[in-house]
Amino acid sequence: MIQEGTRTSADAVAALPRLTELLETATVAADRAHARYSGYQVGAAILDAWGVIHAGCNVESAAYAATICAERGAVAAAVAGGAGDLIAIVTVTRDLDPASCCGMCRQLLAEFGQELLIVNGSLTSDRLRWGTVADWLPNGFLAASLETAPLPAGPHAASAARD
């Protein structure tokens, strides 16, 4: 269930004891965002099972499809840094209402477990919204979906069966 509160609400702190540190790291990352086209700065901070925090920010490109969201940047930094299991990700924007992760980021976060905690925060207010990947992406397309997928029908079905 997706919950709402503030940076100091007991529920938020109980859900993620290092919340303040993660919010600070995400804020620094947001300030470093390369958002020259939209001006929309997003920062992210991931906590791994070893207690290491990995940061990411959005990086925009004139070729819009090449833009990298802060969440995907943080995941890439965590994986490249040899992270343990991912425990939580905190994102921040300057919106009054916390902005949620886009669908592509939710899908990528699902690769790291349905219980991964996602916390979205506002730098303009102290509002937060949080829940697990399963809350944010119900019935997501997961690795198990590939294991049960039927073979394709059509002209290439025979070659797919041989591969």
Q: What are the language-model segments listed below?
A:
Residues 2-35, 81-163:
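C-terminal binding/interaction regions
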Residues 25-28, 70-78:
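Short, well-ordered amphipathic alpha-helical segments that serve as non-catalytic structural scaffolds
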Residues 26, 43-44, 56, 74, ...:
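Small residues (Ala/Gly/Ser/Thr
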Residues 37-39, 68:
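Short glycine/proline-enriched turns and hinge-like loops at secondary-structure junctions
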Residues 39-48:
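Short beta-strand scaffold segments in enzyme catalytic cores
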Residues 47-49, 58-59:
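Histidine- and/or cysteine-centered catalytic micro-motif in compact active-site loops
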Residues 57-72:
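Compact, glycine-rich, soluble single-domain proteins
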